[in-house]
């Protein structure tokens, strides 16, 4: 069962590598990792100890820019990906170069994490979720199945983004050549939450412990500790005290 491991790659003690895996030049893989079958780890990738990378995952992919791309810089060679200790990368997941994943992060099956993204410790990126480029995500967040986080977004610590939640960064919906000056994704402060199938419009801010209920269209900033619902979203009530971040057990 043939693997291709470049002679310059450093493989830690006790690391297991599956069949038909490619590990390119100058890669570092820590001790006790488990690398599945048909995995591709691109040149220079830095992978910590006790990391699990499942079958068909791609680590350190350089982005491709279309002629009309507005947020991807053509020809820019990004720094190698860095993956912290005890992370898990699911089957078919893609983690781009220029990305930093903290310790204990889970990137679930078929999820995609683009370049220039930072993900804090113990955050979960759910199955088939998409994290576009130039995004910052804090620690202990949950970005659930099929959620879409657009470019230029900032998500604080202990945030929850429910399945199929969508964010946007272009108020001009692809029209007007000057629009790129005004791109801005969502900002979710620590403890903020977005419900199932909610849509957040460009530049909106969800303050700490703010909540967008399921199906909400967020057209205005959400105040701290308030639940917003409807289309357009309006304040419904305060977040119950037992759901506030400060009242949660570790």
What is each model feature region?
Residues 2-66, 70-229, 234-235:
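Structural signal for interior beta-strand "rungs" in well-ordered beta-sheet cores
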Residues 232-244:
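C-terminal end-helix/capping segment
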Residues 247-250:
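Phosphate-binding loop/pocket of nucleotide- and phosphate-handling active sites
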């Amino acid at each position: 069962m043939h693997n291709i491991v470049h002679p310059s790659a450093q493989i830690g003690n006790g690391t297991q590598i599956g069949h038909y895996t490619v590990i390119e030049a100058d890669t570092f893989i820590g001790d006790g990792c488990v690398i599945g079958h048909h995995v591709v780890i691109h040149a220079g990738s830095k992978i910590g100890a006790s990391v699990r990378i499942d079958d068909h995952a791609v680590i350190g992919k350089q982005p491709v820019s279309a002629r009309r791309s507005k947020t991807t810089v053509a020809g820019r060679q990004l720094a190698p990906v860095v993956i912290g200790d005890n992370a898990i990368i699911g089957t078919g997941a893609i983690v781009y170069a220029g990305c930093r994943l903290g310790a204990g992060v889970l990137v679930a099956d078929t999820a995609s994490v683009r370049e220039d993204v930072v993900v804090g410790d113990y955050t979960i990126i759910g199955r088939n979720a998409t994290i576009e480029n130039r995004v910052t995500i804090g620690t202990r967040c949950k970005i659930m199945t099929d959620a879409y986080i657009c470019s230029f977004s900032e998500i604080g610590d202990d945030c929850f983004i429910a399945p199929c939640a969508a964010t946007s960064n272009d108020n001009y919906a692809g029209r007007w050549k000057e629009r790129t000056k005004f791109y801005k994704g969502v900002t979710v402060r620590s403890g903020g939450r977005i419900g199932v199938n909610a849509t957040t419009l460009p530049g909106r801010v969800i303050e700490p412990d703010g909540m967008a209920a399921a199906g909400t269209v967020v057209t205005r900033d959400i105040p701290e500790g308030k639940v917003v619902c409807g289309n357009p979203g309006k304040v419904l009530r305060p977040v119950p005290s037992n759901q506030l971040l400060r009242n949660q057990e570790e």
